[in-house]
């Protein structure tokens, strides 16, 4: 049995090596970007949801640069952030240009820290992205808090560490990169008073419709909703419940806009989630038109830099891959396999025009990076 396992592993790595060699030849030594590395990630049992998100984040340059800068700081005790920093550092400092890396330490830590991922079942890539970004932000905030406490202890001002303890946690570079702000506007139809409430986000989840575009979906996200009957709005000016119009607008656009397409819908008659393989076009360039009147950067223009693609018919079955833009060309990362693809091939991941077949390769999470 051990001999068979060894032969199998050897054959697998030979295949990886051949794939890497082919990729290097296809890109060409003269065209290969300086200080760039393209490494597939080994699948440790249905960890494609993790691999695809990590590849997408690696090619979000502002995020990669912050992670690598964190790695150069004095070492701290192991956590999910240090494991991610070690993985990115390992990729960025390989002697070879292409190849395969096993993200074993990161996966082990992930499974240790969150029981949701502590199994060999397929998980949701969006849930993982959300967990990862929030965990990194929490760790950075905790480290900053510890550093300030240690500094106060060194200065002999222990009593001040609880000063302003009710203040919101400080912003981190995760927020600087991914955080945007929505404003929820409600207009009373009786007195015309408008009230608004801001809400921060690290990614936007949008409903999908058949044969549409991501621009259409984003406009739908901001459609005006009428609050009436039992859903009337309590107006502070009128001091009573009134009919009102409610809509969501984008007040602050993030540096990197992560868009989650809500492709999994719970079907009551089936008692389970099913996939909406609708064809939703996502352009290489994007500008949002559903910004608020007081938006800080309404004209911000975005370029598509990465897409996490779901292949299959449901959330707990199928496979995840990532397509990323690196310099002037596109790459497809399928766990340990890395291939160069044409920009036109991205159209294959829009979804299906027919609802008969639910099995498709569909864009699931889009990463747009601002030009400014």
From Swiss-Prot:
Top-rank EC class of the record's enzyme: hydrolase
Q: Known Pfam families for this protein?
A: UCH
**Cellular component GO terms held in the UniProt record:** cytoplasm; cytosol; nucleus; plasma membrane
Look up keyword Repeat and say if it applies. no
Q: Which GO terms describe its molecular function?
A: cysteine-type deubiquitinase activity; cysteine-type endopeptidase activity; metal ion binding
Query: Which keywords label this protein?
Result: Hydrolase, Metal-binding, Protease, Thiol protease, Ubl conjugation pathway, Zinc
| Biased composition range(s): Polar residues | 157-166
Q: Which reaction does it catalyse?
A: Thiol-dependent hydrolysis of ester, thioester, amide, peptide and isopeptide bonds formed by the C-terminal Gly of ubiquitin (a 76-residue protein attached to proteins as an intracellular targeting signal)
Q: From the UniProt entry, list the residue stretches annotated as the region Disordered.
A: 150-169
User: Which parts pass through the membrane?
Assistant: none
USP domain mapped to chain residues:
39-371
Among the GO biological process terms of this entry, one is: protein deubiquitination
Gene3D superfamilies, sorted: Cysteine proteinases
In this chain, Zn(2+) is annotated as bound at: 188, 191, 235, 238
Q: InterPro entries annotated for this entry?
A: Papain-like_cys_pep_sf, Peptidase_C19, Peptidase_C19_UCH, USP_CS, USP_dom
| Subunit relationships | Interacts with WDR48.
Cross-referenced PANTHER family: UBIQUITIN CARBOXYL-TERMINAL HYDROLASE, UBIQUITIN CARBOXYL-TERMINAL HYDROLASE 12
Q: What the protein does?
A: Deubiquitinating enzyme. Has almost no deubiquitinating activity by itself and requires the interaction with wdr48 to have a high activity.
Q: What is this protein called?
A: Ubiquitin carboxyl-terminal hydrolase 12
The source organism is: Salmo salar (Atlantic salmon)
This chain is encoded by the gene named usp12
